[in-house]
Amino acid sequence: MVDPKDWLEFGQKFHGHKCPAMPMGLRVGAAAMNKIGVERAKDGQITAFVDLGDNHCATCYADGLQVIMGTTFGKGNIKKTHKGKWAVTLVDRANGKAVRVTPKAEAMLQNKQSAFFKDYREKGIPASKVPSEVVDPIINNVMNAPEEKLINISEVFDYKLEPHKDSFAGFVCEECGEMTVEEYGRLKSGKQVCIDCAAK
């Protein structure tokens, strides 16, 4: 069983500040992994589809997911669906089994009514400037709340992911001299160039 408490300290270092959203990602990620019986990804064993959008509160949640599940931008096994929600669908590539986990709306609303949000974040104060005595109790609540009070966990279901193969082919752009992945190359006046140079 994956224990989110084992990842809190590392998660805060990785994330850069204390807030309730990153720990919520730890809790949700752990619940998803435990439900389908997977370990933290060392490579691309699992893929996470996160319903977050851009430029809204609590996107810090995604860092908690990345930390605990090992689904990272670098490995390409975490994708944003841009739905403006906090659900994650975790897929085990080995067997095509998946689970959808989301924080309960009540838990999210409770956090949004806290002094952390009302007195600081909504007034434009960065999370790193919020006093520990304000943020620590909310983090404690998120990390210690019973799972059934904090998150919704779906039944396991089938999820078909098309197999993919990493590309190792590349070239040096004939205009800017930067290394470029072959499939992103363009032809411009008979020269092999990158997307940026093709647009000039």
Task: Name each model-derived stretch.
Residues 1-18, 25-200:
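Non-transmembrane, aqueous-exposed alpha-helical and coiled segments at domain scale
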